[in-house]
Design a protein with these regions (language model features):
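Solvent-exposed soluble domains appended to multi-pass membrane proteins
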Residues: 270-632
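Transmembrane and membrane-interface helices of multi-pass
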Residues: 17-252
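N-terminal, intrinsically disordered charge-dense segments
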Residues: 2-4
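The feature marks either
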Residues: 229, 236-241, 245-283, 290, ...
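Alpha-helix initiation and N-capping motif
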Residues: 39, 135, 145, 237-241, ...
Length: 632
């Protein structure tokens, strides 16, 4: 009998628990994997406790449900992180060199640091952006580190760095005492081929959780969506996986958001583009001249919630409320995205914001975008851009120059004594400079001036103290700067031939949080000036991308190259508001207000008399946007 058992052991090399050195390595492998899973799982309740105001109604069971449903991403990322330790364990079966131990120490030290950075950055940014970490901050930081950090205070950054170091230290201590320190060092096994083969199979098996199983779909964020409450779904997301997934899906635009076959998308999209006016004179004229001077005032983070006109906060944007009555108000207007770089492209080029990237990242693509400035330059307009901050932030300068703007006034054009804001020159300084230039310089008319404000942005530190609420006070300050400028400009002879386009770059900061995603995109669009025929309210549904076609149509200029822009005043064109964020798109018409979650691939909100009417149209619109992005 002993001979038979000995023969079985000899013939069966995978009798794993017969060999101490093999057992040690397998236990080490499994410990490494499940330790990563445990650490990722514990991050979720920490996130929820940190944002306890958002999760105030969450029960203890909700915490466990979030951890349970978040496991697929945790298991997947743990698989990625265990692969290298698995290979090192295989190597340890062939050599006991101290080099392997040093590699393990460096590897786990690096992983501890990366995990800490991602978790703390995600923890800090979620309160500002409302979605888990993706690759977006990398673009903002490297385009202008100063501006990327301007939204937060020095102490916020310092505390974040300290938290990263402490968390990284805690993680490394855990890794050291559980994985790195060897009380009984593993020896080179007698049957090293068998040990290596067993560990190789285990390492290869990591492909299963990494991929998410054997089904057709691979691991993605939708795997952890389980609740109708988006806050619960957000808590279940592993921020490190979200960041990695976003970073590796930045450029393959032609493969992203494939909802339907190309022919179906083409047919649906053809019904959503601008149409020839029928009859030709059916478009009402808003201006009393065809070549007015045009001043765009792009308001940082403004929204309808700040205006009493829309039922928002009274006594905040008092000048905007005044202009809404004196000028032309578009009352059902939407921001196309959630950040300045996406908002600028929507306003200036009629190009919708993208959920997974920003076209501003790719100067070779923005070079090929149509733009209002270029169209007006060809019509004889003089172009200038004014901004109190860094014009290089998010590649804005390259975009503006490629749009035909020759004169760019930015932070470097103001003396240091006037750059007192976190973002550079405060708004009142910006408008004083603009007014001074307009008075002193011999203005070549007609002109287009793009003015971008910055003070109504985190950290909301402004030289103005009318309201107790810091955030509302910053918006009231920006509003007062616009009001004072327009009041003084009215005294200039250019007033009678000028139209001001007042539009936010996106909505943000107030109120917070916003539960309904539709409420997070509503912004005002107001036209005012001496070139306006008469005040009126236009209730057509539209968004920032429609400004280009509408304005150029009023000037009698072609706008065919603005593929996604529609004339808001054209009764023959389809009208809708469209917007995207990193995890959803929305399409809004009087009949249907729809939001589709791109992570979960499910309808998040569906209201109106014709529920679901905008679902396929919204998908086709996004698919065609990415087709266009891939070609540029």
């Amino acid at each position: 009998m002993r001979k038979i058992r000995k023969s079985i052991v000899t013939l069966y090399p995978f009798n794993l628990f017969k060999f101490t050195d093999m057992k040690k390595r397998i236990i080490q492998f499994l410990t490494t994997y499940f330790l990563f899973v445990l650490l990722f799982a514990l991050q979720k309740p920490i996130f929820m406790v940190y944002y306890r105001e958002l999760y105030i109604n969450a029960s203890l069971g909700d915490y466990f449900r979030v951890m349970w449903h978040g496991l697929p991403l945790d298991l997947s990322l743990a698989g990625y992180l265990t692969a290298i330790p698995g290979l090192l364990l295989i190597a340890s079966a062939w050599t006991d060199s101290s080099v392997l131990r040093r590699i393990r120490q460096v590897y786990f030290g690096l992983i501890a640091f990366i995990m800490a950075c991602i978790f703390i950055v995600d923890l800090g940014l979620y309160g500002f952006w409302g979605f888990r970490l993706d690759a977006t901050p990398i673009f903002y930081f490297f385009s202008s580190p100063k501006d990327a950090m301007a939204s937060v205070s020095f102490w916020f950054v310092l505390l974040g760095i300290v938290a990263m170091l402490i968390y990284a230290g805690i993680l490394y201590c855990i890794f050291y005492y559980v994985l790195i320190r060897e009380k009984n060092p593993m020896k080179i096994p007698y049957r090293r081929q068998n040990v290596s083969l067993a560990l190789l199979l285990l390492t290869a098996a990591l492909f299963i959780p990494i991929r998410g199983g054997f089904t057709v779909s691979t691991m993605n964020l939708s795997k952890v969506y389980f609740s109708s409450d988006q806050l619960m779904n957000h808590a279940a997301i592993n921020p490190a996986f979200s960041f990695m997934y976003s970073a590796t899906h930045q450029n393959n635009f032609e493969k992203q958001y494939r909802f339907m076959d190309p022919n179906t998308a083409d047919k649906l999209f053809a019904k959503m583009v601008d149409k020839p006016a029928t009859p030709a004179d059916s478009i009402p004229q808003l201006l009393n001249t065809q070549r007015p001077n045009i001043v765009f005032i792009i308001l940082e983070s403004f929204s309808t919630h700040l205006m009493e006109t829309f039922g928002g906060q009274p006594n905040v944007a008092v000048n905007m409320d005044k202009f809404a009555k004196e000028g032309i108000l578009f009352s059902n207007f939407y921001a196309n995205s959630f950040r300045t770089d996406r908002g600028l492209a929507s306003i200036i080029s009629g190009y919708p914001g993208q959920p997974s990237t920003s076209i501003m990242k790719y100067p070779e693509k923005t070079d090929k975008l149509p733009s209002i400035p270029r169209s007006l330059k060809n019509a004889g307009y003089n172009l200038e851009y004014y901004y109190g901050g860094d014009a290089d932030f998010t590649n804005m300068r390259s975009y503006l120059v490629s749009s035909g703007i020759g004169k760019i006034i930015c932070d470097k054009d103001f003396p240091l004594s006037e750059r007192t804001g976190k973002w550079g020159a405060q708004d009142h300084v910006l408008f004083q400079r603009l007014l001074k230039d307009m008075k002193e310089e011999k203005q070549q008319e007609p002109f287009l001036k793009l003015v971008q404000t910055s003070s109504s942005h985190e950290p909301f530190e402004v030289p103005f103290h009318r309201l107790d609420d810091k955030v509302l006070n910053a918006f009231a300050y920006a509003d007062s700067c616009v009001g004072d400028f327009i009041k003084q400009y009215q005294e200039l002879p250019q007033w009678k031939n000028t139209v001001f386009v007042l539009v936010p770059d996106h909505q943000g900061a107030y109120p917070y949080p916003i539960e309904n995603p539709l409420d997070g995109q509503t912004i005002p669009l107001i036209l005012i000036g001496g070139a306006i025929k008469e005040p009126r309210v236009i209730d057509t549904y539209a968004s920032q991308i429609d400004i280009a076609a509408t304005l150029l149509s009023q000037l009698g200029l072609p706008h065919d190259e603005f593929t996604f822009s529609k004339d808001i005043l054209n009764p023959s064109s389809p009208h809708f508001g469209y917007f995207t964020r990193p995890n959803y798109f929305g399409m809004v018409t009087p009949e249907n207000q729809l939001v589709y979650n791109l992570d979960a691939n499910t309808v998040q909100l569906d209201e109106g008399t014709e529920k679901g009417a905008n679902l396929e149209k919204g998908k086709a619109f996004l698919q065609k946007l990415y087709d266009d992005l891939a070609k540029r």
